[in-house]
Amino acid sequence: MKITINQASEFVGKEVTIGAWLANKRSSGKIAFLQLRDGTGFMQGVVVKAEVGDDIFATAKALTQETSLYVTGTINEDTRSPFGYEMAVSGVEVISESHDYPITPKEHGTEFLMDHRHLWLRSNRQHAIMKIRNEIIRASYEFFNKEGFLKIDPPILTGSAPEGTTELFHTKYFDEDAFLSQSGQLYMEAAAMAFGKVFSFGPTFRAEKSKTRRHLIEFWMIEPEMAFYKLEDSLQVQENYVAFLVKAVLDNCRLELDRLGRDVSHLEKMVAPFPRITYTEAIERLHELGFDDIVWGDDFGAPHETAIADSFEKPVFITHYPKAIKPFYMPEDPENDQVVLCADMIAPEGYGEIIGGSERIHDLETLQARMEDFDLDQEAYSWYLDLARYGSVPHSGFGLGLERTVAWISGTEHVRETIPFPRLLNRLYP
């Protein structure tokens, strides 16, 4: 019977066949240990010469790294194995032999591994990170479905963008100018006026010339929008959502977290509610910590976010940023017209902002005035202004960056490892 590695627990004591690749191999005299992977997991196969005969043992010893094969044998429990099971091999059939596999078990530099990203994905570490990424995506759909949100797919090619045009990828749309989407937010606002609570999940593109461990040129975002929600309502959704994601990974990816050496004691503290401080309070705290390079009105850099987050064991909301450093669609605080009703969620352990969100302006005259302040072409945004013309309501939304969230939960240092094929400032290959 053919099974997959993740089904091994159901077949203890039975002879089965697994289609796999040889991740690694070692031999000791008359025993060969095969490290097998099949995409669902990793398992050791033990080949004993006295039990399989000379021919099968010779085949096993001659196997090269990443050769594909069918391995037949009996599944046994093994408490020494991280997986908990191993196979006593009785047969080996080579499907396709691998020659001179470039990523050997020795240490390799980052650029070499990135040049071979199509192969690096096969490694134990990358497998664990991608499984955690998949679980976060799966849990996101579960959370928003349970909360009554409708999945909406905004366009990737747009003629306008919510953040301006300085960091957009330009392309031609037949005889018109078009841009790769930085965010689906404006379209999601339109959808919220039709369906109440909506969310999207898709790629976004930002032509930022940043080379930090937090930045990608192409990344994926979850973007909910909610009609009749004020800022505090949105913050409660955000903290419940992030707590749900962390719990899902703890419940369903414990083996992967162990494989990555992640200290789960940090993650086990991630229960709502999360702390909240205002931008002004954050500036004051930074000054107390000796950060003299920042004044009220400046945006935070990575060191500032890290210093603020270090004061808390959970993600922290920084609310009420200065109006001058936030986008046009954010409404002023009725009690202070110098700040807007917004919040960024900063992850602990130095992982930075993982969510940005705000209330949205729903008054037509206010929205038009703000667009004038930003020198935006109102004709290009006429469809968006229609939302305010025809029965808009108070509404809020946010965007969660998938890769930064994966990096934080998995304990991965650089976001380049949290997406299968990263697009960076200096990398468009493979």
UniProtKB/Swiss-Prot annotation:
Q: What is its EC number?
A: 6.1.1.22
Q: Which GO terms describe its molecular function?
A: asparagine-tRNA ligase activity; ATP binding; catalytic activity, acting on a protein; nucleic acid binding; transferase activity
User: Mostly located where?
Assistant: cytoplasm
Reaction equation(s) it catalyzes: tRNA(Asn) + L-asparagine + ATP = L-asparaginyl-tRNA(Asn) + AMP + diphosphate + H(+)
- InterPro entries per record: Aa-tRNA-synt_II (IPR004364), aa-tRNA-synth_II (IPR006195), aa-tRNA-synth_II/BPL/LPL (IPR045864), Asn-tRNA-ligase (IPR004522), Asp/Asn-tRNA-synth_IIb (IPR002312), NA-bd_OB-fold (IPR012340), NA-bd_OB_tRNA (IPR004365)
Q: What class of enzyme is it?
A: ligase
Cellular component terms, GO, for this chain's entry?
A: cytoplasm
- BP GO terms, sorted: asparaginyl-tRNA aminoacylation
Which keywords does this Swiss-Prot/TrEMBL entry list?
Aminoacyl-tRNA synthetase, ATP-binding, Cytoplasm, Ligase, Nucleotide-binding, Protein biosynthesis
Instruction: Report if keyword Aminoacyl-tRNA synthetase is assigned.
Output: yes
Its localization reads: Cytoplasm
Pfam families, alphabetically? Answer: tRNA-synt_2 (PF00152), tRNA_anti-codon (PF01336)
Is Cytoplasm tagged as a keyword? yes
In the record, the note on similarity to other proteins reads: Belongs to the class-II aminoacyl-tRNA synthetase family.
Subunit composition and interactions: Homodimer.
Q: What is this protein called?
A: Asparagine--tRNA ligase
* Source species of the chain: Listeria monocytogenes serotype 4b (strain F2365)
What's the gene? asnS
